[in-house]
Amino acid sequence: MKELDQNQAPIYEAMVKLRKKRIVPFDVPGHKRGRGNPELVELLGEKCVGIDVNSMKPLDNLGHPISIIRDAEELVADAFGASHAFLMIGGTTSSVQTMILSTCKAGDKIILPRNVHKSAINALVLCGAIPIYIEMSVDPKIGIALGLENDRVAKAIKKHPDAKAILINNPTYYGICSDLKGLTEMAHEAGMMVLVDEAHGAHLHFTDKLPISAMDAGADMAAVSMHKSGGSLTQSSLLLIGKQMNPEYVRQIINLTQSTSASYLLMASLDISRRNLALRGKESFEKVIELSEYARREINAIGGYYAYSKELIDSVSVCDFDVTKLSVYTQGIGLTGIEVYDLLRDEYDIQIEFGDIGNILAYISIGDRIQDIERLVGALADIKRLYSRDGKDLIAGEYIQPELVLSPQEAFYSERKSLTLDESIGQVCGEFVMCYPPGIPILAPGERITREIVDYIQFAKERGCSLQGTEDPEVNHINVIKRKEN
C-alpha cells in the first residue's frame, strides 16, 4: 500500500487532473459541464460547474471506495485520531443516523439526553429503538439545557443495563460540554457503545486549549460537521469510528440511505479542509479562540447582554466549555434572541447562526476577521440603545423536558388526527415541533403535550421563531395520536 501523508489531498488532486483533460461527457449530470445550463455557470462559475461530475473509474466511488476516496478517508482518520473515517455527503444528519442505526435495532434501548438534534429522534423512528431520556438540568439565568450529569447517567445505566448505546451531545450548540471521558469509561464498563454528536466540535481535536474531542475521549463513533467549523462546503460531514466498530458493517448502514450520485464538490471540499486542519488547525483555531474571547469581552462591556463562557463550569452539569461558541443571553436588554437575530439581519446586514427565546449564537470560525467582530459588537450596542425594553413579558426557560408516552416509531406510524394547539393539550404528539435552527424538537412523536409546552410554542411563534416539523405550516394545528378515548 502506498504511503500517505497529510500534505496530500487525493480527491482534490484527482479533480485538478480531470479539469485539465478534454473528456467528452456522455454521462450524467445532464448539464454537461455547464454547457446545458448557462445560468448555473453564471451563478457558480465555470470552474465549479465543470467539476460537478459523477463517479467514474479515475474518481472512485463513495459507496465502495478502493482508490482516491479510500485514501482520503484514511487521511481523515489519521488527522482526527480515529480508527476509520467516512466522508458523508448527506450532512451530519446522515452521520448521526448512521451511528444509531449501526448500534441499535428495533426494541433496543439507547440512553440519550432529550435535547438532541431531530436527526437522532428521526433515527429512532427509522430503526424502532427505544429512547431512555436523561433528565437535563437547566441554567436558571440563561434558560438553556446543560450537559449530561454523570450521576444521572449512572442511574440510567443501572436501571437499563440492557441498553445498547449512549448518545452524547458534545459540545452543545451553546458550547456546553459534559464529562466526555468519564461518561465514555462508564458506558464501556457497562458494555455500551458511546456515540457522540460532535456536529459543533470539528475543531476540538486540533488544540489542547479546547475541550477533549470524542475520539480522544475513547468514543466508539462521532458525527463531525466539517462544514460548521472545519471549512468545507455545506452538507459535507465526517463519521469517525473507533477500533471497536466494524467499518464494513457501518459502510453497509451508510449505503442504505446515502445517494449513489455523491457530490465530488462536497467530497473535494472535505479533502481540502482536512488537509488544512491537519497542517494548520492548531494555529487557525487558536486564532478563533482569541477572536471569540475578544468579542465576548466587548459584548459584556456593552451591558445588558451576557456572553457566557467557562464561568458556567461546575464540574457536574457543565464540565467544560467551548470558548469558540459566542453564545449571548439577550433578555437583559428586554429582547428575545430571535428578535435580536432579526434586527441584526434586517437592520445591520449581519447574519448570525440562530436566535431562540433567550439567546443568540454567533459562529466564530476560521473565516472570520477582527473587522467582522467589531461590526457585530457595534451592531449589538446599537440595538441595545435603540430597541431595548423592560422585558417583563418574556419567558425565561429555553428547555422543557416532555413526558415520553410512546416510542417515536410507534407514535409516528400511528393513526393521527389534527387538533388546534389548545385542543391538543393532554394528547400524545404524533409529529415534530421545533424551532430551526437549532433543530432540537420542542415536541417529538410519542410525547405528552402540556399547557406549558403549548404556551412556549405560541410565544415562540409570536416572537418570530421559525417553527417546523408539523403538517400545518402555520403551526396552528398539531397532529396527535388518534385513540378511542380521544
Question: What would you call each of these model-derived segments?
Answer:
Residues 294-469:
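Conserved C-terminal alpha-helix-loop-beta "cap" of PLP-dependent enzymes
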Residues 1-67:
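N-terminal "arm"/small-domain region of PLP-dependent enzymes with the aminotransferase-like
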Residues 466-486:
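Charge-dense polyanion-binding interfaces
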Residues 5-16, 20, 40-43, 64, ...:
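Conserved PLP-enzyme active-site core in the AAT-like
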Residues 59, 86-88, 166-169, 327, ...:
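Short glycine-rich or small-residue beta-strand-to-loop segments that form or flank ligand, phosphate
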Residues 33, 173, 228-229, 244-246, ...:
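Short, glycine-/Ser/Thr-/acidic-enriched flexible segments
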Residues 49-94:
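Conserved N-terminal alpha-helix of the aminotransferase class I/II PLP-enzyme fold
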Residues 87, 133-135, 224, 354, ...:
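Structural signal for conserved beta-strand scaffold positions within catalytic alpha/beta enzyme cores
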